Amino acid sequence: MTEQIYVGNAAADAPAGRGWLLGHFQPDGDPRHSDDVEIKWAIHPPDDRRAQWVTGEQRSAALILISGRFRVELPGRSVLLAEQGDYVVFHGVSHSWHAEEASVVVAVRWPSLAGYALSPSDNGTSAVS
């Protein structure tokens, strides 16, 4: 029987998957494999940014600030996550982001779809989306 429980530490596990802990990209049979949702533990140094906007977005996302100061740029709106627990939810919206201070952010996206990854050179040092 395939193990249905996985116990880990987000900070320790995140580097192996560019921050992504759960999603379609985890191996079949791994309890962290899901076609329904993706979860990322993103650690951003100060001034980390993705200036390139995600375009053609069809997924939904929730970004939750654990620590730091993190700005999400959305069409016609800039959202600052400044206090622990601040979050933003958006559906099918193009976006970019900027870590104004060293920040830790949890990103939840749904559904988990292949084909959205940007190369690290296009994506800053640690992409949220």
Language-model features, listed with the residues they occupy:
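A short, N-terminal "cap"/entry segment at the start of jelly-roll beta-barrel domains
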Residues: M1-P46, R50-W53, D122-S129
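Double-stranded beta-helix
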Residues: I5-Y6, H98-S129
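Glycine- and acidic-residue-biased ligand/ion/polar-headgroup-sensing regions
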Residues: Q58-R71, P75
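Short acidic-glycine-tyrosine-enriched beta hairpin
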Residues: G76-S94
